From Swiss-Prot:
It comes from the Bacteria. Its main location: cytoplasm. This is tRNA-specific 2-thiouridylase MnmA. It comes from Pseudomonas syringae pv. syringae (strain B728a). Gene3D superfamilies: Adenine nucleotide alpha hydrolases-like domains, HUPs, Translation factors. The record marks 133, 348 as: Interaction with tRNA. It is found in: Cytoplasm. The gene is mnmA. Residues 103-105 are annotated as: Interaction with target base in tRNA. It is an enzyme of class 2 (transferase).
């Protein structure tokens, strides 16, 4: 079902988070067609300090302004760079320093787009906010549920799992019922400047730079040895923070005597010894886990876990739903999967679903081996 349109007797004021992309542009158009009083707001979340617009903020603002001018709505601007640094970026650095691989987009949604932006919009007198995320919401039995977007290729519920039901209840998601080609068609129909603009990829504050170059500005590299599972030293790494579980590219391993031609993969980041443990083969047994542990789960709405519960989960964006059993333990939460899960990565998020309902999720802290023989 589509997000509810306002009644004739109550014209609600909605402020749309305008990113300068096609999804938020079309969101504004759809809300206007539904009769809302629509305004836009452009958020700047990163201060470029090197004279180069890596985040393309200037270009994105110009595109957002062009769209707002075209459809005849006001565009506000807000700078949340301080909030982003304190609540997102510093955590991002701490996670890498601890050897984990974080996902800043999830924290950005919780702390910036559905907190700082929401608070700012309410201060401006908005009744609701709206974003161009491919998700849906449903109001039922006095609570608001977060649902997967209708387009399985674009569903973004994975990234919004840490946003609470109260925030979801104040948000409209106009493109959540649409598929991407439909969104672009609407943009072209209305002559929007963003109709053919490419989707943004990667982390905003890194932009076009190489990730290793960016991270090196903030964290000192700590080179160490690359070892096989048998303990043989076969190379050196420039820093564990530059690598992630399941990584194949950029290891600099090759031409080893008596080794097969199978590619090498990162299996373990040994923080205690600053060693990168690698193995050959896409299906190396050390790459697979049967369970994971998270100490804290952010629920969209509270759920009953007085006994183990059958759900599905994703351990990465765009992964298919994986059947699992979730249980509350003394140390947090443990999800046991029906099938082996490849490259379960501490620092990334596990997100739980009940059908199309996104229940919530948490940061992966421990990935348990698929078999007891896999001594990591």
């Amino acid at each position: 079902m589509r997000d509810p349109a306002p009644s004739n007797s109550e014209m609600k004021r909605v402020i749309v988070g305008m990113s300068g992309g096609v999804d938020s542009s079309v969101s504004a158009v759809l809300l206007m067609e539904q009769g809302y009083q629509v305004e836009g707001l452009f958020m700047k979340n990163w201060e470029e300090d090197d004279g180069t617009e890596y985040c393309t903020a200037r270009e994105d603002l110009a595109d957002a302004q062009a769209v707002c001018d075209k459809i005849g709505i006001k565009l506000h601007t807000a700078n949340f760079a301080a909030e982003y640094w304190d609540n997102v970026f510093e955590h991002f650095l701490e996670e890498y320093k601890a050897g984990r691989t974080p996902n800043p987009d999830i924290l950005c949604n919780r702390e910036i787009k559905f907190k700082a932006f929401l608070d700012y919009a309410l201060m401006l007198g908005a009744d609701l906010i709206a974003t161009g995320h491919y998700v849906r919401r449903r109001d039922i039995d006095g609570r608001t549920e977060l649902l997967k977007g209708l387009d399985p290729n674009k569903d973004q519920s994975y990234f919004l799992h840490a946003v609470g039901g109260e925030q979801i209840a104040r948000t409209l998601f106009p493109v959540g019922e649409l598929e991407k080609p439909e969104v672009r068609a609407i943009a072209e129909k209305h002559g929007l400047a963003t109709a053919k603009k490419k989707d943004s990829t990667g982390i905003c504050f890194i932009g076009e730079r190489r990730f290793t170059d960016f991270l090196r500005q903030y964290l000192p590299a700590q080179p160490g040895e690359i070892k096989t599972t048998e303990g043989e030293v076969i190379g050196r790494h420039s820093g564990l923070m530059y690598h992630t579980i399941g990584q194949r590219q950029g290891l600099g391993i090759g031409g080893l005597k008596d080794a097969s031609d199978d590619p090498w993969y990162v299996l373990v980041k040994d923080l205690e010894n600053n060693e990168l443990i690698v193995g050959q083969g896409n299906d190396h047994p050390w790459l697979f886990s049967r369970a994971l542990v998270s100490s804290e789960i952010y629920w969209v709405n509270p759920i009953d876990l007085s006994s183990p519960r059958r759900l599905t989960a994703k351990v990465r964006y765009r992964q298919g739903d994986q059947p699992c059993t979730l249980e509350k333990t003394a140390d947090g939460y443990r999800a046991t999967f029906d099938d082996p899960q490849r490259a379960v990565t501490p620092g990334q998020s596990v997100v739980f679903y009940d059908g199309e309902i996104c229940l919530g999720g948490g940061v992966i802290e421990i990935a348990e081996p698929w078999t007891t023989k896999d001594k990591r």
